[in-house]
Amino acid sequence: MTRHSTDGLGHRQAIRALALPALIRLVSEIADNGPINRRRGSLQAAFGNLTANQLGHAIDRARDFGLVYGDEHERVRYRLTDSGEDLADVYDTAARWARTHQFPAATSDFVTRVQHTLPLLGQDPALARDVARVGTSGGLLLPGGAVLSPQATSALDGPQAALTAWLQANVSLQHDMALHTARTADEMETAA
């Protein structure tokens, strides 16, 4: 098994930033259904189950990270950048792996699958060497007590390669993502 290194604090913080559920929804929705136009109610129709705050936060993060763009005077309000399109492919790859391996559960939705898979992709490659020695079924013991089979762990190579390639192509964004992740954590701590 060839593991692609995504270790390092910057990568882990970037992965945490990319795992924001509303950001996953925003990027995936635009990738699947095309740009969101300026018609009244189009944002609410596309993201009816997100609160205005969740949607606003996701749009702000996506803009800050260079994933979406739009001109207030254009008919199209939000569209994905090339980086956003590539990230949508990473999300799809992660979700396919998770669906195949029923992770984190057999009935998980797309966002939950991506949100739980991205942190696995950033794990230290040394964990892969331990896969035969950890867990009751010879798999990788995950936080919460779940065990990932050796086959599932081995199959992480594809999604991890996709994420690593995206992070390397967007290395300039990692600093911004780390700042936003730290700021969001501080804001949440203050609010609690």
Describe the predicted segments one by one.
Residues 1-11:
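Long, low-complexity, charged/polar intrinsically disordered regions in eukaryotic proteins
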Residues 9-54:
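N-terminal helix-turn-helix DNA-binding core of bacterial DNA-binding proteins
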Residues 30, 191-192:
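C-terminal regulatory/effector modules of DNA-binding transcriptional regulators
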Residues 37, 56, 71-74:
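Long, low-complexity hydrophobic alpha-helices enriched in A/L/V/I and glycine
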Residues 56-63, 76:
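Short, hydrophobic-biased segments on the C-terminal half of alpha helices
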Residues 63-73:
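A short, conserved structural fragment
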Residues 73-97:
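Basic, amphipathic "hinge/linker" alpha-helix immediately C-terminal to the N-terminal HTH DNA-binding motif
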Residues 89-190:
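Amphipathic alpha-helical dimerization/coiled-coil segments
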